[in-house]
Amino acid sequence: MTDVTLKALAAERQVSVDRLVQQFADAGIRKSADDSVSAQEKQTLLAHLNREAVSGPDKLTLQRKTRSTLNIPGTGGKSKSVQIEVRKKRTFVKRDPQEAERLAAEEQAQREAEEQARREAEEQAKREAQQKAEREAAEQAKREAAEKAKREAAEKDKVSNQQTDDMTKTAQAEKARRENEAAELKRKAEEEARRKLEEEARRVAEEARRMAEENKWTATPEPVEDTSDYHVTTSQHARQAEDENDREVEGGRGRGRNAKAARPAKKGKHAESKADREEARAAVRGGKGGKRKGSSLQQGFQKPAQAVNRDVVIGETITVGELANKMAVKGSQVIKAMMKLGAMATINQVIDQETAQLVAEEMGHKVILRRENELEEAVMSDRDTGAAAEPRAPVVTIMGHVDHGKTSLLDYIRSTKVASGEAGGITQHIGAYHVETDNGMITFLDTPGHAAFTSMRARGAQATDIVVLVVAADDGVMPQTIEAIQHAKAAGVPVVVAVNKIDKPEADPDRVKNELSQYGILPEEWGGESQFVHVSAKAGTGIDELLDAILLQAEVLELKAVRKGMASGAVIESFLDKGRGPVATVLVREGTLHKGDIVLCGFEYGRVRAMRNELGQEVLEAGPSIPVEILGLSGVPAAGDEVTVVRDEKKAREVALYRQGKFREVKLARQQKSKLENMFANMTEGEVHEVNIVLKADVQGSVEAISDSLLKLSTDEVKVKIIGSGVGGITETDATLAAASNAILVGFNVRADASARKVIESESLDLRYYSVIYNLIDEVKAAMSGMLSPELKQQIIGLAEVRDVFKSPKFGAIAGCMVTEGTIKRHNPIRVLRDNVVIYEGELESLRRFKDDVNEVRNGMECGIGVKNYNDVRVGDMIEVFEIIEIQRTIA
């Protein structure tokens, strides 16, 4: 028999290599997968396996089942039989010889310890008894000597003072009695201590003996509990309870009539009682054809005194009913606990993991959070990455305020004209470019500066190594400049400041330094860490110094990445191309991305069918810090998602589908959560006007930025609702959705196709195209302003002073007035002021001048005024006439 490798032997035996290695280890032979196995080693392994096969089982389980019948009296004198089945199961574990020897040694040591403790206790008791006897003898001698001296003294003083002698004797007797009592108590305490010591030693020995007997290998099953006496015992308990109840009732009746004390109940199993007599009489009646029985049963279950704390396993989402089942409580208790925490839910509602954890911990249970992404972790861990890290190019993000010259600066570096291609001259999505310089390669990310693109700038700061903060020398620090500083600090990346537009006459770079120093950006000449470079994107001055500063900062950072192996990176931007499908701009962080790789990207997956660089040229691979556009994904990924190359497309699809389902569950759980503080907002929701919008844009980042900006415009009276959003042109489905929801169709750098235009014309939908985000936001603001209810404002048009008061049978009190300001008009609302305090507000009913009804009276003229439903007009009052005007409100 020739030697074979362990792998070949495993294949021959049809077992795994790891299993065979373990079997060799159990047989005392250490082998690895590539080692050879000799014939002698095979014989050793075979003998070991045979020994394991013939050895008896390690466990022996005995099961016993007993059945009995219990008769229970029912209503109407009828009884019913209940079948009772008692199942018992006992498992005996076989001990190995070493374990048996160890237990025997422990038992022997326990017996020796017990014997030693008993001997020590006896010796201690003897010593204490001897010491006690000696103390008692000494005390007895002292007492006898004292008594003798007292007797002699008493005989001498007996004649002189009999009364004093009696008192002395009494005191001495009392003292002797107390001493005797103290000695007796001490003796009892010593005996009690000795008795406790012996009992403790005996208890320890008994416990050790019992444990040794339980651990022995024995096939004797435990005795089956005899249930034949069950009915007798139950009936006896019931009779005792009934007798006790009768005694309490009779004792309560007899308290007010000097009743005799109740006699104690008879002890013993066969004690006669009222229940026994009634049961005997019932048996006699039953023999004569009666159907009643006097026996009764009593339930012996007692409610647990304290709550049971359980380990509750909670997944990422769980319903209220499932959570209640895991805690073994009713669903109403869980709902009550959630209401105490401020959340309302139904029993079938899905809640998120954090809420379920709070509820379970509030109810006193221990929470175990279960991770449901084992498959995802397995796919991510099964990646082949190289070990050696090599230097890589820095990723530089250009940030700053809008119109401060970021894209123009990058244009000069790339010697291209990208800014002219941007709508309105402003950047509206991230551009990724890499340029070759004399000192090395640099990858640039150009971010938008408009306020709406906050999330884009945050993404750019997270994916970058160095931030170039562009500040216009004539404009200074602006809001988006401050925001860019905050993003850079949050991402923990160094900042290089490029002071742009230095060629302008009004440029003031020192002011820029002073303003930036207030936000923690200090130049190196002031003792800070940030490099300041004066540049001009138009003239090209300072560009070389800026590139040198970037490369110097990158050299300080010592940027390295693994160049070989499976790639990983981040999505910078994504969009839907009509001819190519979903397109994602990916920045590779480590590894090398090849054409044909299987990538997992957020909720999407796919095989890389094509790769293009920023110039639109086809490339076959992309290393670290290289931005590329990839085609072949199953859908448009979200900007900011992680891109990972995996081995298996099937597993990638499973992970993507799992992520989609998990995202949907968590989203539903958060949507359904309705807290108490939002209850009144939900009640008044029907009174709020809504502007429904269906949004389509060219890239994912623009959709995200526009959605955030529009949702921030919502007020308490008018809310913006994004009914649907997506990347790509406006389709027939989008138009149908807008028609069904009465929404406005908004296209940002996209157009509607022919089928969508037909639906838009037939349904008369409002379709708007935009290429600049400013115009879109302004028009939505105008539409929302039209839905606002107008503001009502009171404007005083006249003031009259009461000079005299007349009585009219038709109108009551008529005020004779002089108009002091403005004009008094009929049927306008008025206020009556007395000492500049409003005492009545109503309507002007009658206005006359020289007994003629007039519509208005001008300043400086007299008139008679009748106030509707008011007669308490006095001389000196002022009558103020006003009108209510409406002012159209706008959204700021």
From Swiss-Prot:
Keywords: Cytoplasm, GTP-binding, Initiation factor, Nucleotide-binding, Protein biosynthesis
Main location: cytoplasm
InterPro entries, sorted: DNA-bd_dom_put_sf, EF-G-like_DII, EFTu-like_2, IF2_assoc_dom_bac, IF2_II, IF2_N, P-loop_NTPase, Small_GTP-bd
Function: One of the essential components for the initiation of protein synthesis. Protects formylmethionyl-tRNA from spontaneous hydrolysis and promotes its binding to the 30S ribosomal subunits. Also involved in the hydrolysis of GTP during the formation of the 70S ribosomal complex.
Location of region: Disordered: 88-305
Gene Ontology BP, a term: translational initiation
Species of the source: Salmonella typhimurium (strain LT2 / SGSC1412 / ATCC 700720)
Molecular function, one GO term: guanosine tetraphosphate binding
Region feature (G1): 400-407
Family stated for the protein in its record: Belongs to the TRAFAC class translation factor GTPase superfamily. Classic translation factor GTPase family. IF-2 subfamily.
Start and end residues of each stretch annotated as G4: 500-503
Protein's cellular compartments: Cytoplasm
Binding site for GTP: 400-407, 446-450, 500-503
Protein name: Translation initiation factor IF-2
GO cellular component, one term: cytoplasm
Keyword Nucleotide-binding: yes
Claim: Nucleotide-binding is one of the keywords in the record: yes
Origin superkingdom: Bacteria
